[in-house]
A protein has these predicted regions:
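Short Pro-Gly-centered flexible turn/kink motifs
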Residues: 105-118
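Short beta-strand elements
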Residues: 144-178
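Short, surface-exposed ligand- or partner-binding patches at beta-edge/loop junctions that are enriched
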Residues: 121-149
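Structural beta-strand segments of beta-rich domains
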Residues: 35-37
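Bacterial Sec-dependent N-terminal signal peptides
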Residues: 1-26, 39
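Asparagine-centered strand-capping/turn motif at beta-strand->loop junctions
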Residues: 39-48
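The feature marks short-to-medium sequence segments in extracytoplasmic or secretory-pathway proteins
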Residues: 51-107
Length: 178
């Protein structure tokens, strides 16, 4: 019993604690009556972070992609957008003819953030999947990693959103299959 308490219990604690992600998609729900998707993202860390443009996509049974817009849980910041455009020149939002601002989602430490998305469809559609992805997180090729490193460095040094830093690590996506 003594060996169990001294060796096995601490080992089990280390394993269970290490499996918890820093930032994770905690829950995702589709409300077909309201035509909304609720996403809950949990920050398990002691730091305040923000995410850039988490994207929900909805695919129908006929492989049609439905437009989805974030309607709750975000802020916008013009200076932050210009910093992102100075690094991510490939981004469509940075093109002059296409003006929009990125959604910024604040994730206070040790909390769950709720984000709502709305989709528009005049007729009834059969939804196949609902998916959330993170376009500014978790690059695997060298160019993407360098761009991500430069973006984090520029955003964090600018301290645009006081008390928060840009979260650029990989976040596991979530997909609901209907």
């Amino acid at each position: 019993m003594n060996v169990f308490c001294k060796i096995i219990l601490p080992l089990l604690c280390i394993i269970s604690c290490s499996e918890r992600k820093e930032i994770e998609v905690y829950n995702m729900e589709l409300d077909e009556n309201k035509k909304e998707v609720l996403v809950e993202i949990r920050n398990n860390t002691e730091n305040n972070y923000y995410l850039l443009s988490p994207i929900v996509s909805i695919m129908t049974k006929h492989l049609q992609d439905i437009g989805v817009e974030m309607i709750e849980g975000q802020i916008h910041h013009k200076k932050l957008d210009s910093i992102v455009c100075s690094v991510c020149i490939w981004d469509d939002i940075c093109k002059e003819e296409y003006y929009a601002m990125r959604e910024i989602v604040l994730l206070p430490k040790k909390s769950v953030k709720k984000i709502k998305y709305k989709y528009d469809s005049e007729e009834y559609i059969e939804i196949e999947t609902v998916h959330i992805g993170f376009p500014y997180n978790g690059y695997y090729n060298e160019i993407g990693k360098k761009m991500q490193f430069m973006l984090k460095k520029k955003l964090d040094s600018s301290n645009i959103i006081k008390g928060y830093e840009f979260y650029n690590k990989d976040i596991e996506t979530m997909t609901i299959k209907m």
